[in-house]
C-alpha cells in the first residue's frame, strides 16, 4: 500500500476508541507522572475527556472523519480541565478541519496532513518550542517520521509504526529536560528527571493510530484472501 491507500471513517473511529482505551488503561500512570511536576490529575482528566468523546460519538455518529475528529476535540475542550483540554482539543479540532467534510474515503497522506495540522494547533495554542518538555516534544517527531515514511512509499501502517516509535523516543527525551512551559516550569531544575505527562499521552495517541492502521491493513488482507478463488 502506498500514499493512495484508502482510509475510511471507520479507521479514524477505531483510532479514537483505541486512544480512549489506552488512556483508561494508563490513567493512574499518567496521573503519577503529573504528580511529580503538575496537579496529579492529567490521567483522570484525559480519561474523563476521552470517555465523554466516545459517548458523544455513540450518541450521534459523525458523517465523516473530519466531523468525527472535530467532535472529539470540542468534547475535550469542554470536559478536560487544565492545559490538556485546550491543547488536545485544539489538536483534534485542527485535524478535523484539515480533513473537512470529505466523503468516507481518504488517503494515507490525508492522515499525515491532519496530524501536521494538529501539531500546528498545539503550536498556536501553547507556543511550545523543541525541548520545552511538552507534548510537542513527542508530537513533532512523530509527524516528521510519518511524513518521511509515506514519502518513501511506505504503507500507512508502516508509517504510523515509525511515528509511534518516534513519539516514544520524544516522550522519553522529556525526562532529562528542564520544563519551560506550564505549571512544571515553576519547579525549575526540580522538573528535571520527570517525564512530561502530555508527551506520554501523545505517545499513546500515536500508538492508537498505529494499531488502528495495522488492524485495517489486516482486515483488508483477509478480505482479499477471501475473495481469491
Set out the residue ranges of the language-model regions:
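N-terminal loops that bind phosphate or other acidic moieties
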Residues: 1-229
Amino acid at each position: 500500500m502506498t500514499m493512495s491507500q484508502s482510509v475510511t471513517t471507520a479507521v479514524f473511529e477505531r483510532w479514537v476508541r483505541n486512544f480512549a482505551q489506552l488512556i483508561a488503561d494508563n490513567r493512574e500512570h499518567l496521573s503519577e507522572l503529573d504528580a511529580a511536576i503538575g496537579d496529579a490529575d492529567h490521567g483522570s482528566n484525559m480519561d474523563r475527556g476521552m470517555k465523554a468523546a466516545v459517548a458523544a460519538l455513540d450518541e450521534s455518529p459523525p458523517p465523516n472523519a473530519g466531523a468525527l475528529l472535530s467532535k472529539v476535540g470540542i468534547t475535550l475542550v469542554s470536559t478536560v480541565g487544565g492545559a490538556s483540554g485546550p491543547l488536545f482539543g485544539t489538536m483534534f479540532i485542527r485535524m478535523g478541519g484539515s480533513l473537512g467534510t470529505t466523503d468516507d474515503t481518504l488517503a494515507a497522506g490525508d492522515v499525515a496532513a491532519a496530524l501536521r495540522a494538529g501539531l500546528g494547533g498545539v503550536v498556536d495554542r501553547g507556543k511550545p518550542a523543541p525541548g520545552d518538555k511538552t507534548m510537542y516534544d513527542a508530537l513533532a517527531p512523530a509527524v516528521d517520521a510519518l511524513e518521511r515514511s509515506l514519502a518513501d512509499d511506505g504503507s500507512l501502517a508502516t508509517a504510523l509504526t515509525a511515528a509511534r516509535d518516534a513519539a516514544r523516543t520524544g516522550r522519553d527525551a522529556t525526562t532529562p529536560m528542564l520544563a519551560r512551559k506550564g505549571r512544571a516550569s515553576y519547579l525549575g531544575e526540580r522538573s528535571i528527571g520527570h517525564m512530561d505527562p502530555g508527551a506520554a499521552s501523545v505517545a499513546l495517541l500515536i500508538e492508537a493510530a498505529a494499531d488502528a492502521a495495522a488492524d485495517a491493513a489486516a482486515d483488508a488482507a483477509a478480505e482479499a484472501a477471501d475473495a481469491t478463488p
